[in-house]
Amino acid sequence: MGTHVLLLGEGNFSFSQDILKILIEHPPKDEIRSIVATSFDTRSEVLEKYSNSEKTLNGLNANEIVTVLHGIDATKELKAQLMNTPSEMTSFDHVIFNFPHLGYEDLKAHSSLIAHILYRYPCAYLQLFTQLV
């Protein structure tokens, strides 16, 4: 069956790149079937913000188990946002929630964002994910 991993809130996608590298060098017992790496930013915003991101994105996209998605808003219903992806993944074994941000520095606002996501959409997340990491 294999394992499906969702990475939410990537910035420059270096975390996804490192995860992929580790999985290649040290394959887990259970085969990784897919990695879906997402960012809130559009692709052009990622390329503009992070100088080495094009190389990173190209490396991720070259691997057949990786799907990179931009413009994914974790505060909104995810299942619909993921339905039209090449992998059409709507269920994941592991979810890694990286760096949710509002695009500016404000600790109280960031805390409110996370609270909003977890309070407002717990049922949607439980239906979408088989296990939260």
Stretch-by-stretch model annotation:
Residues 1-24, 28-30, 34-40:
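Conserved class I S-adenosyl-L-methionine
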